[in-house]
Regions:
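Nucleotide/phosphate-binding sheet-loop regions of phosphoryl- and nucleotidyl-transfer enzymes
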Residues: 1-271
Length: 271
């Protein structure tokens, strides 16, 4: 756990047991500590990440690097500290989407709404985690559309609504960053990895470690996995499950779930 982080170590153990774990790889806490010292991703690490990406493409039979004959490979990028720090650090989902791959994803899945909903979510998460643009900027645009159309839920958004929001979200990114939203998936990934490394030292993470007497010197791992989608329709969903009841400690399964949603919706209580 000190090297792979709690999440990475557990994913590796589950894989070794033959459980159905989405394929991926983990960047170690050692790499995080070096990044925090140097403040730059070094060439050897980038080459190792790209090498593992190519293996992931072969494993999933999808393409991250732009082969239009294959379904796009989208990634989740998650922090994974050795000690559990729930909600303290950052996650990015649907990484790899751009103006080209979103159309390919719509074609390969025959689900245009899903593709554009995933793109909308990705732009918001990336902008918040990497560029540190406040989520409220995106939420205001989302709520404006929902109020105008008299929608009760994000899942009521139409394809046209989603395309409009994507353009609005990109404009927010440009207004804050004075540059266009990055289209290159590889650049997206390296920026995301850096952001997760930096999240080890964000104020809420530091406060949490102080309160729980966790060392500030360990760093976080980064878990990169092939996406599994909970927002593909009414037969898809996402949830959180505990092997014990966290309220009273009873030895019973406990959890909650949402249909046609992604993990952040459950954690954030959006619906």
């Amino acid at each position: 756990k000190d090297i792979l982080g709690g999440k990475g170590a557990n994913l590796a153990e589950m894989t070794s047991l033959g459980l159905n774990v989405p394929p991926g790889f983990t960047i170690s806490t050692t790499a995080c500590r070096k990044y925090l010292e140097d403040n730059v991703l070094w060439l050897e690490l980038k080459e190792t990440v790209l090498s593992n990406l190519r293996l992931l493409e072969l494993k999933t039979e999808k393409s991250f690097l732009g082969n239009r004959n294959l379904q796009p490979l989208l990634l989740s990028v998650r922090s994974g500290a050795p000690n559990s720090m729930p909600g303290m650090m950052d996650t990015i989902l649907n990484l790899g989407l751009n103006d080209t791959s979103v159309k390919l994803m719509a074609d390969f899945t025959s689900n245009e709404r899903f593709a554009y909903d995933s793109y909308r979510r990705f732009i918001e998460m990336f902008s918040n985690v990497v560029a540190e643009i406040p989520r409220i900027e995106f939420e205001k645009q989302l709520e404006s559309v929902k109020i105008e159309k008299n929608y009760n839920s994000d899942s009521d958004l139409t394809i046209s609504d989603l395309k409009l929001l994507i353009e609005k979200y990109k404009k927010i990114y440009f207004d804050f960053e004075k540059t266009e939203f990055p289209e290159d998936p590889t650049r997206q990934l390296f920026l995301a990895v850096e952001a997760v490394f930096r999240s080890w030292n964000n104020p809420r993470a530091i406060t949490y470690r102080n309160l729980h007497k966790i060392s500030h010197d360990i760093g976080t791992a980064v878990n990169i996995q092939s996406m599994v989608f909970g927002n593909m329709g009414k037969t898809s969903g996402t949830g959180v499950l505990f092997s014990r009841n966290p309220i009273n400690g009873n030895d019973e399964l406990f959890g909650e779930y949402l249909m046609n949603a992604q993990g952040e919706d459950v954690v954030a209580g959006i619906r």
